[in-house]
From Swiss-Prot:
<comment type="function">
    <text>NDH-1 shuttles electrons from NADH, via FMN and iron-sulfur (Fe-S) centers, to quinones in the respiratory chain. The immediate electron acceptor for the enzyme in this species is believed to be ubiquinone. Couples the redox reaction to proton translocation (for every two electrons transferred, four hydrogen ions are translocated across the cytoplasmic membrane), and thus conserves the redox energy in a proton gradient.</text>
</comment>
<feature type="transmembrane region" description="Helical">
    <location>
        <begin position="9"/>
        <end position="29"/>
    </location>
</feature>
<keyword id="KW-0520">NAD</keyword>
<dbReference type="GO" id="GO:0008137">
    <property type="term" value="F:NADH dehydrogenase (ubiquinone) activity"/>
</dbReference>
<protein>
    <recommendedName>
        <fullName>NADH-quinone oxidoreductase subunit A</fullName>
        <ecNumber>7.1.1.-</ecNumber>
    </recommendedName>
</protein>
<keyword id="KW-0472">Membrane</keyword>
<dbReference type="Pfam" id="PF00507">
    <property type="entry name" value="Oxidored_q4"/>
</dbReference>
<keyword id="KW-0874">Quinone</keyword>
<keyword id="KW-1003">Cell membrane</keyword>
<dbReference type="GO" id="GO:0030964">
    <property type="term" value="C:NADH dehydrogenase complex"/>
</dbReference>
<keyword id="KW-0813">Transport</keyword>
<feature type="transmembrane region" description="Helical">
    <location>
        <begin position="88"/>
        <end position="108"/>
    </location>
</feature>
<keyword id="KW-1133">Transmembrane helix</keyword>
<dbReference type="GO" id="GO:0005886">
    <property type="term" value="C:plasma membrane"/>
</dbReference>
<dbReference type="InterPro" id="IPR038430">
    <property type="entry name" value="NDAH_ubi_oxred_su3_sf"/>
</dbReference>
<comment type="similarity">
    <text>Belongs to the complex I subunit 3 family.</text>
</comment>
<dbReference type="InterPro" id="IPR023043">
    <property type="entry name" value="NAD(P)H_OxRDtase_bac/plastid"/>
</dbReference>
Length: 119
């Protein structure tokens, strides 16, 4: 195996990491450090904070976010499948039907458990 073929990929990764890290390091090293009370105080739309910033969120928000990610991922798999359906034939069709069936079973389970009810 010839590792010279991977040199452009490694160089690309190093340049990408450098572009992301260099401004952060330069800002930390060259930026002014003059903290004072007003700068370190919490800010809430021009007013003093009314309550503690660490409020509890309802678990349903997180559950809806996770469900959104799952079904968004389903669409990410569904689009390339639909584009290449003619090339993959019946095997690809039935593989996607099994995948969609598993997701539908999961969706029905979440619905029956009441994960989508806000009451």
């Amino acid at each position: 195996m010839n590792l010279e073929n991977y040199l452009p990929v490694i160089l690309f990764i190093l340049v990408g990491v450098g572009v992301g890290v260099a401004p952060q390091v330069l800002g930390f090293l060259l930026g002014p450090r003059r903290p004072y009370a007003a700068k370190n105080s919490p800010y809430e739309c021009g007013f003093e904070a009314f309550e503690d910033a660490r409020m509890k969120f309802d678990v349903r928000y997180y559950l809806v976010a996770i469900l959104f990610i799952l079904f968004d991922l389903e669409i990410a798999f569904l689009f390339p499948w639909a584009v290449s359906l003619r090339e993959i034939g019946a095997t690809g069709f039935w593989a996607m039907m099994i995948f969609l069936g598993i997701l539908v079973v999961g969706f029905v389970y979440e619905w029956k458990k009441g994960a989508l009810d806000w009451e």
